[in-house]
Amino acid sequence: MTGAGPGLTPELAVGYLQELSADIRAAVVLTPGGEPVAGPPELAAAASRLLAAAPEAAEIEVAVAAGAVHAARGERHAVVAVCGRYALPALIRYDLKVVLGELAADPDGGEPAERTEAA
């Protein structure tokens, strides 16, 4: 698998995850504190609650009949992915770790650039 490349932003990370696996239905990137950075807003609140429920866990997997939710944390970001029922957990966890590594390598920290008003 080829890495996402340097300068992966949280917005690009969400799309990259969905390209990596057809089983990933949606993904969200959050700060370590659970604040949403990128991804669908309707997923961000639930993802934040999931991470808050297991504050010491580096990885989380919740499976139900319809699919699974996988989460992974790094020092600078957390990533949560909603997957279909046939997703392979080990591969999804690997993909999440790859994305976390690429986000950590971003010199800007994955934060949106400051916007300046045009004069």
Q: What positions do the PLM features span?
A:
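Non-catalytic interaction/Regulatory regions outside core domains
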Residues: M1-A119
